[in-house]
Curated annotation (Swiss-Prot):
Main location: mitochondrion
A GO CC annotation given for this chain: mitochondrial inner membrane
The Solcar repeat ranges on this chain: 1-90, 100-193, 203-294
Source taxonomy: Eukaryota, Metazoa, Chordata, Craniata, Vertebrata
Protein name per UniProt: Solute carrier family 25 member 35
Annotated organism of origin: Homo sapiens
The entry's keywords: Membrane, Mitochondrion, Mitochondrion inner membrane, Repeat, Transmembrane, Transmembrane helix, Transport
Family note: Belongs to the mitochondrial carrier (TC 2.A.29) family.
Length: 300
C-alpha cells in the first residue's frame, strides 16, 4: 500500500507541475554548448517561455509529455517513497534516542531513488524528447519526431534494443541520488525538528507543508547542474548504434557545459526548476504524508 500511495501522490503533483517541466526542459536545452550571447534566446525567462510556447506551439503544448511524466512519477516515486516509507516505519532511520538520523535518511533516500530512477529511465528519456519537440521557430536542442510515448518506446527498442532504451540511465543516477537524498533527508529532519519545537501539532498538515517547502528549496539548489546535464544526455542525437554523439556521460556533459557556457550554464532553467521542483516536492511530499496518515489512522 505504501508503494501505491507514493505513486498516486507523485502523479497528483505531476498534473499541476508538468507545464513547468516543459518550460524547464526547453530552457535547459537553449544555447546548448554555445557561448553566452552567440545564440538567439527564444525563452528569456519562465514567464516569457510560458507565453511563447502557448502562442507558437499552442496551449496544449504546455502539457507535452504528460503521459510518460505520469507513468515515470508513478514508477519512480512509487518505488522511491514507498521503500523509504517502509524503512521509516520499520525504525531503520532513527537513532537510539528515537530521532531521525540525517545520514541514514540520506542513504535510504539515495538508494530508493536509484532503484526507481533506473527502472523508469526509458520513460524519462521519452518524456524529455517529447517535451523538447517544438515548432521550428522556437526549437532548441535536438528535435526527435515522436508521435507519442508508445510509438517512441517501440521505435527506440526496435532500432537500438534494450541498450538504446536505457541510454543515459547511469548518467541520470547522480541527479537522482543528489535530489532524492537531499529531498527525503531534509523533509524528515525538518519534520522532526519542528515536532521537537512543538510549533505545530504532531499530525498537523502544516507540519508536512513547511517541511516540504524547505525540502523543495534544498533540492533545487543541489540538483540543478545534474538536472541540466541529464536533460542534455537524454536528448542528444545518436548514431546508428544508438550511441550519443555529443556527450560520453554525465561528467563529460557537466565539463563541456561549464567550459563552453560558463558556470551559469550549469544552472540554466533554475528559475523554472524552482517553480517546478518546489511545488512538485511540496505537493508530492504533502500528498504522500497525508495519504499515509489517513491510511495508518484508518487501519489502527
Amino acid at each position: 500500500m505504501d508503494f501505491l500511495m507514493s505513486g498516486l501522490a507523485a502523479c497528483g503533483a505531476c498534473v499541476f507541475t508538468n507545464p513547468l517541466e516543459v518550460v524547464k526542459t526547453r530552457m535547459q536545452l537553449q544555447g546548448e554548448l554555445q557561448a553566452p550571447g552567440t545564440y538567439q534566446r527564444h525563452y528569456r525567462n519562465v514567464f516569457h517561455a510560458f507565453i511563447t510556447i502557448g502562442k507558437v506551439d499552442g496551449l496544449a503544448a504546455l502539457q507535452k509529455g504528460l503521459a510518460p511524466a505520469l507513468l515515470y512519477q508513478f514508477l519512480m516515486n512509487g518505488i522511491r517513497l514507498g521503500t523509504y516509507g517502509l524503512a521509516e516505519a520499520g525504525g531503520y532511520l532513527h537513532t537510539a534516542e528515537g530521532t531521525h538520523s540525517p545520514a541514514r535518511s540520506a542513504a535510504a533516500g539515495a538508494m530508493a531513488g536509484v532503484m526507481g530512477a533506473y527502472l523508469g529511465s526509458p520513460i524519462y528519456m521519452v518524456k524529455t524528447h517529447l517535451q523538447a519537440q517544438a515548432a521550428s521557430e522556437i526549437a532548441v536542442g535536438h528535435q526527435y519526431k515522436h508521435q507519442g510515448m508508445f510509438q517512441a518506446l517501440t521505435e527506440i527498442g526496435q532500432k537500438h534494443g534494450l541498450v538504446g532504451l536505457w541510454r543515459g540511465a547511469l548518467g541520470g543516477l547522480p541527479r537522482v541520488i543528489v535530489g532524492s537524498s537531499t529531498q527525503l533527508c531534509t523533509f524528515s529532519s525538518t519534520k522532526d525538528l519542528l515536532s521537537q519545537w512543538e510549533i505545530f501539532p504532531p499530525q498537523s498538515w502544516k507540519l508536512a507543508l513547511v517541511a516540504a517547502m524547505m525540502s523543495g528549496i534544498a533540492v533545487v539548489l543541489a540538483m540543478a547542474p545534474f538536472d541540466v546535464a541529464c536533460t542534455r544526455l537524454y536528448n542528444q542525437p545518436t548514431d546508428a548504434q544508438g550511441k550519443g554523439l555529443m556527450y560520453r556521460g554525465i561528467l563529460d556533459a557537466l565539463l563541456q557545459t561549464a567550459r563552453t557556457e560558463g558556470i551559469f550554464g550549469m544552472y540554466k532553467g533554475i528559475g523554472a526548476s524552482y517553480f517546478r521542483l518546489g511545488p512538485h516536492t511540496i505537493l508530492s511530499l504533502f500528498f504522500w504524508d497525508q495519504l499515509r496518515s489517513l491510511y495508518y489512522t484508518d487501519t489502527k
